[in-house]
């Protein structure tokens, strides 16, 4: 789109320049014709004054009007011939310039366009690099804050839980019956839910929450090893 606009502007500029050149040529041609006629007329008057054969009865010399008409026609003819010759020379020069102008104009327009697009690309590169630098700085600050928060959280003494350190795919299982000497006792499920929530909270820490709430939660110890053995008796 920009290239089309630039081409249209260049065409309009060159068309206006050609019209202005034509007007200047016409004005120059008219000036040359007028000067040639005026100079020839002055030469004729000087000739008449040099060969002055006036008589006392008439203020004008003999055959004055005939000589004036003749000089005017001759001066006009000479002026037209000179003007036509000069016009033909100017047309030939303008055609040669037009034949050689598009290459230089096209190359100059291409150079200016390439320099302009190169400048735009460089400005875009600087903008993108500035954005990337800002994003990198923001990411670095976020990671630094996260590391600092993790270090603060780890600085407090905390018990390491068995369920948080190992992977348990079957956590949400129904309570298991335990055989005792007199009756069957089911393991309470209240100990499982906080361990699940705490394990999830430890596996996915919320960086945007306050550190005091996360540190204050303490995980209960796992069930006794003997109860697990009794829950799965040997068959």
UniProtKB/Swiss-Prot annotation:
The modification Phosphoserine is found at residues 135, 138, 141, 149. A motif (Bipartite nuclear localization signal) lies at residues 95-113. Down-regulated in gastric cancer tissues. The keyword Nucleus applies. Its main location: nucleus. It comes from the Eukaryota. GO terms for cellular component: intracellular membrane-bounded organelle; nuclear body; nucleoplasm. Belongs to the MYCT1 family. May regulate certain MYC target genes, MYC seems to be a direct upstream transcriptional activator. Does not seem to significantly affect growth cell capacity. Overexpression seems to mediate many of the known phenotypic features associated with MYC, including promotion of apoptosis, alteration of morphology, enhancement of anchorage-independent growth, tumorigenic conversion, promotion of genomic instability, and inhibition of hematopoietic differentiation. This is Myc target protein 1. It comes from Homo sapiens (Human).
